[in-house]
Swiss-Prot record:
Coiled coil: none annotated. GO terms for cellular component: cytosolic large ribosomal subunit. This is Large ribosomal subunit protein bL19. Keywords: Ribonucleoprotein, Ribosomal protein.
Amino acid sequence: MNLIQTIEAEEIAKAGKDIPTFRPGDTLKVGVKVVEGERTRVQNFEGVCIARSNKGMGSNFTVRKMSFGEGVERVFPLYSPNIDSITVVRKGAVRRAKLYYLRGRTGKSARIAERRDYRSEAGEG
């Protein structure tokens, strides 16, 4: 491990965030800290993760949701102090790493089937 990777590993450990394991296709609820005047509140942004980039401290993920018939996408830095929480609502079964094709789809064609993890259930019992 070189010096830059060592420094990034220390910064990630110092951030102390508990980030759940998620993949593109999963439905996420991201709690974003919003500052309004002197008050700070948490606003939830719920949508489908369409992309994830793992680059140490520069890791980010893109979440897409439909809001009043319009598609809204936000790119969140994974270790941002403005992210309060990340919750996996539903796991999706997809065969691509980037789901940019969902941008051109609406309605039933934009649905993603739910992923069933049989291996984890078999390991418990």
